[in-house]
Amino acid sequence: MMRKIRILSALLTVLMVFGAFGTFMVPTADAAEPVVRAPISDDDQKRMEDMELYLTSPNGQYELYMDAATGNFAYVCVPTGSVSFSTPSVSGRNTSAYKATVLLSYKSRTGYYNNSVTTLNSFDNASELGQVIIKRIKNGVRVEYTLGEEPTVYYIPIVIDKDRFEELILNKITVARDKSIVTVRYNLYDVTGLDPNSEKYKGYVAACPQCVNGPVYMLNSSVEATSSAAKNIAGVLEKYTDYSYEEYQYDTTKHNVEGTVGKTAVFRMALEYKLDDSGLSVSLPGESLAFDADAYTITAVDILPYFDAADKQQSGYAFVPDGSGAIIEFEDALYQGKILTIQNNLYGIDYATHVLKGSTREVFRLPVFGLVKDDAETGAREGFVAIITEGEAMGSITARCEGTSSGKVHAAWATLNPFVTDQYNLNYGANFPITLVSDRRYTGDFTVKFIMLQDEEKIAAAGLTDTYRASYVGMADAYRDYLLDLGVLSDLTTETSIPLFIETFGSVKYDDKILSFPVEIDLPLTTFEDVQSMWQRLHDEAGIDNVSFILTGFANGGIMRQKYPSSLKWTSALGGKSGLKDLVTFAQANSFDIYPNFDFLYSQNRNSSGLSYKHHAGRMIDNRYITKREYNPATQTFSMSNSTGVSITAAAYDELYSKLLKQYSKYEFTAISVMTLGTGLNSDFNDDAPYNRENSKMFTEQVLERMASDYKVLVSGGNSYTLPYASVIVELPTDSSLLLAGSESVPFVGMVLHGYKTATGEILNTAGDTDYAVMKAIENGVGAYFQLSYQNVHHLKDYVYLSQYYAVDFQNWYEEMVEIYNEINNNIGSLQNVLITNHEFLAGTRIVTEEELEAGIDYVTEVDNRIAHVEYGNNTSFILNYNYNFGVKVEYKGMEISIPELCYVKIVEDNGIYVSNFGGDKLITVRYNGTTYTIGAGETVQIY
């Protein structure tokens, strides 16, 4: 079979070279529609000379060529001739790691304070040692690596009598230099004539107990039987002496010592490659990872870290799912002369660990990353998008753009972290952290799917309809199609307005006095009747119908010290059962949804019926209960004493939901809110039943599936595993972390989900800048979300953990809420069922004001960032100027549009161009064909 593959590969190469790259036909698997082969460039063909064809996709569109010696490969799109290589073509010093398909990092388990990490790469530590094996498997190919040099044991004496050592070894070595190789590694222990009570005698005996029977030489403890020092000694003994294995056995037996072989770091693993009609899947099978777990722990395995990497001559960017999405422009790294890196775990903080990181950053909620690059010679733009399809809860994503003089490439990759490691500082007076490692490692598969992104001219030339353009928009299209193929997404029902979600608080425990006696009461913040009043006012006065209410703290004790929802008791002070039933009836009659909100992830009250911390609470590695520790921005730390709940193990969700359902199902609810299940994911290191985050993800999916079979489910954040079950996602990320390493935020999440999921952005009445938040809602296509209560809200400032809700008064916010809602709705209300089809950043010119001109300040007038252009599917688009301090002029479809600072325009193409200004009281000007149009607030003008 291999011979046939080699012949076919050679034939294809000959036909390409002598046929001037003329096209010919490659049959598909079913031979129904042959694929036209496009030429592969000379440079790519040269790199593929040592590779053989191993796999072809069922539709004949993709091929995988592989180098049997290294495991490196070329991933080919047949119709376009595009090739993605597993490793880049680099030269120079210290470049061997770039030739690796795997980077494996590990720590030694010996010594509490051993925190150093060693990294092996598959090129130096496997292929260069001849330790790569390629095997054919069903529908794929498996590449097996042995990372680390297999030990060779050298049999040299460990303890030997002085006379034997001198007679058999030292006296036989005639060259002084060679003799010193031996003598410097052995110490003489002779206690003859020494006082047994002397310190010298005791020291000798402690170091070498055998010396009490006579003088002996002992090998230095630093020399392991597999080390280079042992190799050098063995070489001298072989050259000059007759010291044999039998002599070695005699000495070890006489002196009762064992020839201990030093621990050698050797790791075995495999990558499995498969092709389907959409592209390449690469899997690290958990069963393939083998090593000495008593001696080492694996901290990270980077899978194809330099796949399709760009060199420093290419322009482009790397994409990571930081919040809404972020890109790192290669040019920014080069301009700054730095290495720009964005890296994070999937799904945010794991509170089961003592050391918490990433508190002020947005979460990586979708397991997607990618890279786009321009060919330095042809200008063709190509790249890839990668989706972690298995094991992502144990993974992280990295984008790294090397702009330093020594840097070689720009790349993006996924990493598996099979063990959870944690650090504790035992000495509070000094920084001596110890490392603890979870006993249980992830043993499932870690799989990444790579989908090619193609140059648009190549797509058109090949007549392809099932491939994706090389941009972050193409990445979003590919991921959306992937979710659609899985049945995760479905079209929204027809909506003509954006949703308005109001999360309202029920009650809070309050210290009061009755007849001078101190009592604790349930202080109402919003009653069931108040919810009806809020809906009625919004409906009657503002004409807003698409309203839903999230009821937080209406049961089980309110919003502080709330009991876990393993039981259910509606608060009497809010109207009790009868008030709730009236609200449910009212909601049904007026066709709006109510979502009672329950926290399944954390418990605020140990005295919850049906809940036992002993059986249901999650444990940290040191066996303490997992707590949700709050971040203190003043100290930039987390505190164990500053926690707001104990984490419940995900393994108990299903059991505890069953208890809630017995009572919840008695009411005519159509929906339920479990906000924290969409945003949090913790491990559980309980000794009796430990679970990693991948296990917790599975348990969360199971309970969400049950909930979704009975109710519409609302979650917060929208971690990817909730997408099949969540009807509504609030606080969907609409911005990135705005890290210094990032070049731009992009609405990747919005592009994927718009038209398929009902979603809102951040809480608008607590946003740092409402205008900015509104623009982000328009750019991402999300609805409005407010946290508001109806009465007694001034008391919230008296509570440390509730003082953040300083602006939740419904009456105070009513007019501004209606204004904000109408602004977003006027812009995108009619677009709820269409896709976001394109997004880009426009170049513009800074508008220098008269005051700035008079000040004589020299301004950079060219602006090439913070001007976003987003297009929706029905010929509607927006240009948004996110610059805070100045307006900009942009050219668009023959128009010169002047947009003030932190403002935007809406453009509709419908038998002409219509420009609208729905962004407040600032004026928009448009110049076209010598005519200037001024567009006031709320106005729409036809330009042509």
Task: Label each PLM-derived region with a short phrase.
Residues 20-33:
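Sec-dependent signal peptide cleavage junction
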Residues 1-11:
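Bacterial N-terminal signal peptides that target proteins for export
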Residues 497-655:
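Aromatic-lined carbohydrate-binding/catalytic grooves of carbohydrate-active enzymes
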